[in-house]
Amino acid sequence: MDDPKNAESLLAIWKSYDNGNVSAAKDLFADTISAELGDGMIVRSSRDSMLAQVQAVRNSFKSAIDQVDAVMAVKSTDRNEHWVLIWGTETDTYKSGKVDSTHLQETWRFNKNGKADLVFQYKRPGTPPMRSK
Protein backbone atom coordinates (compact mmCIF):
# COMPACT_ATOMS: atom_id res chain seq x y z
CA MET A 1 0.00 0.00 0.00
CA ASP A 2 1.02 3.60 -0.44
CA ASP A 3 0.10 7.09 0.70
CA PRO A 4 -3.67 7.58 0.22
CA LYS A 5 -3.18 11.22 -0.89
CA ASN A 6 -2.58 10.02 -4.46
CA ALA A 7 -5.85 8.06 -4.38
CA GLU A 8 -7.59 11.21 -3.14
CA SER A 9 -6.02 13.14 -6.03
CA LEU A 10 -7.32 10.60 -8.54
CA LEU A 11 -10.81 10.79 -7.07
CA ALA A 12 -10.63 14.58 -7.47
CA ILE A 13 -9.58 14.12 -11.12
CA TRP A 14 -12.57 11.84 -11.78
CA LYS A 15 -14.88 14.28 -9.96
CA SER A 16 -13.68 17.22 -12.06
CA TYR A 17 -14.58 15.23 -15.19
CA ASP A 18 -18.04 14.45 -13.80
CA ASN A 19 -18.54 18.14 -12.98
CA GLY A 20 -17.59 19.13 -16.53
CA ASN A 21 -14.57 21.19 -15.48
CA VAL A 22 -11.40 19.16 -15.97
CA SER A 23 -9.21 22.25 -15.51
CA ALA A 24 -10.24 22.24 -11.84
CA ALA A 25 -7.81 19.33 -11.43
CA LYS A 26 -5.02 20.95 -13.48
CA ASP A 27 -2.61 21.15 -10.55
CA LEU A 28 -2.86 17.38 -10.02
CA PHE A 29 -1.12 16.67 -13.36
CA ALA A 30 2.56 16.78 -14.29
CA ASP A 31 3.71 19.12 -17.07
CA THR A 32 3.80 16.18 -19.53
CA ILE A 33 1.34 13.28 -19.49
CA SER A 34 1.33 9.94 -21.29
CA ALA A 35 -1.86 7.95 -21.72
CA GLU A 36 -2.74 4.59 -23.24
CA LEU A 37 -6.51 4.75 -23.59
CA GLY A 38 -9.09 2.00 -23.70
CA ASP A 39 -9.82 2.62 -27.38
CA GLY A 40 -6.18 1.91 -28.32
CA MET A 41 -5.13 5.55 -28.63
CA ILE A 42 -1.69 6.40 -27.23
CA VAL A 43 -1.08 10.04 -26.35
CA ARG A 44 1.89 11.94 -24.95
CA SER A 45 1.41 15.67 -24.65
CA SER A 46 1.63 18.70 -22.44
CA ARG A 47 -0.75 18.97 -19.52
CA ASP A 48 -2.68 21.85 -21.09
CA SER A 49 -3.07 20.06 -24.42
CA MET A 50 -4.19 16.81 -22.75
CA LEU A 51 -6.70 18.58 -20.54
CA ALA A 52 -8.10 20.49 -23.53
CA GLN A 53 -8.61 17.18 -25.37
CA VAL A 54 -10.32 15.60 -22.36
CA GLN A 55 -12.50 18.69 -21.90
CA ALA A 56 -13.58 18.48 -25.56
CA VAL A 57 -14.68 14.87 -25.02
CA ARG A 58 -16.51 15.80 -21.82
CA ASN A 59 -18.23 18.71 -23.58
CA SER A 60 -19.82 16.25 -26.01
CA PHE A 61 -21.94 14.92 -23.13
CA LYS A 62 -24.86 16.48 -21.31
CA SER A 63 -23.68 14.69 -18.18
CA ALA A 64 -21.14 12.14 -17.01
CA ILE A 65 -21.46 10.21 -13.78
CA ASP A 66 -18.71 7.96 -12.49
CA GLN A 67 -19.49 5.32 -9.90
CA VAL A 68 -16.26 4.23 -8.21
CA ASP A 69 -16.17 0.58 -7.19
CA ALA A 70 -12.67 0.56 -5.69
CA VAL A 71 -9.56 2.71 -5.52
CA MET A 72 -6.20 1.95 -3.94
CA ALA A 73 -2.75 3.48 -3.81
CA VAL A 74 0.18 1.10 -4.22
CA LYS A 75 3.95 1.47 -4.38
CA SER A 76 6.22 -0.37 -6.78
CA THR A 77 9.11 -1.18 -4.47
CA ASP A 78 11.46 -2.31 -7.24
CA ARG A 79 11.12 1.02 -9.08
CA ASN A 80 10.12 3.28 -6.19
CA GLU A 81 7.03 4.44 -8.14
CA HIS A 82 3.65 5.50 -6.81
CA TRP A 83 0.55 4.12 -8.53
CA VAL A 84 -3.20 4.36 -8.03
CA LEU A 85 -5.60 1.70 -9.29
CA ILE A 86 -9.26 2.56 -9.81
CA TRP A 87 -12.29 0.58 -10.97
CA GLY A 88 -15.65 2.06 -11.81
CA THR A 89 -18.50 2.59 -14.24
CA GLU A 90 -18.99 5.78 -16.22
CA THR A 91 -22.51 6.59 -17.37
CA ASP A 92 -22.66 9.27 -20.04
CA THR A 93 -25.74 11.10 -21.27
CA TYR A 94 -25.25 12.53 -24.74
CA LYS A 95 -26.80 15.84 -25.69
CA SER A 96 -29.24 13.84 -27.84
CA GLY A 97 -30.48 12.08 -24.70
CA LYS A 98 -28.81 8.73 -25.46
CA VAL A 99 -27.39 7.07 -22.34
CA ASP A 100 -24.32 4.84 -22.50
CA SER A 101 -22.13 3.24 -19.87
CA THR A 102 -18.58 1.94 -19.77
CA HIS A 103 -16.80 -0.18 -17.17
CA LEU A 104 -13.33 1.23 -16.49
CA GLN A 105 -10.12 0.10 -14.86
CA GLU A 106 -7.37 2.70 -14.81
CA THR A 107 -3.82 2.53 -13.53
CA TRP A 108 -2.29 5.96 -12.83
CA ARG A 109 1.33 6.76 -11.96
CA PHE A 110 2.09 9.73 -9.73
CA ASN A 111 5.56 11.29 -9.73
CA LYS A 112 7.59 12.21 -6.64
CA ASN A 113 5.72 15.55 -6.50
CA GLY A 114 2.34 13.82 -6.34
CA LYS A 115 1.41 14.74 -9.94
CA ALA A 116 -0.18 12.27 -12.38
CA ASP A 117 2.13 11.64 -15.34
CA LEU A 118 0.99 8.32 -16.83
CA VAL A 119 -2.32 6.49 -17.18
CA PHE A 120 -3.29 3.11 -18.60
CA GLN A 121 -7.01 2.77 -19.25
CA TYR A 122 -8.94 -0.44 -19.88
CA LYS A 123 -12.62 -0.35 -20.71
CA ARG A 124 -15.53 -2.42 -21.89
CA PRO A 125 -19.09 -1.45 -22.74
CA GLY A 126 -21.51 -1.48 -19.86
CA THR A 127 -24.85 -3.16 -19.71
CA PRO A 128 -27.49 -0.93 -21.31
CA PRO A 129 -29.78 0.74 -18.79
CA MET A 130 -33.04 -1.07 -18.10
CA ARG A 131 -35.95 0.40 -20.02
CA SER A 132 -38.81 1.60 -17.91
CA LYS A 133 -42.08 -0.20 -18.50
Which sequence ranges carry the predicted segments?
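Low-complexity, intrinsically disordered terminal/linker segments enriched in charged
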Residues: 118-133
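A short, glycine/Asx- and small/polar-enriched loop/turn
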Residues: 78-83
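A solvent-exposed, acidic/Ser-Thr-rich amphipathic alpha-helical stretch
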Residues: 22-74
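Exposed beta-sheet edge and beta->alpha loop/turn motif
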Residues: 85-115
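Short beta-strand segments enriched in hydrophobic/aromatic residues
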Residues: 29, 88-92, 123
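Short, low-complexity N-terminal intrinsically disordered segments enriched in polar/charged residues
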Residues: 1-19, 23
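Hydrophobic pocket/interface hotspot
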Residues: 13, 24-26, 33, 50, ...
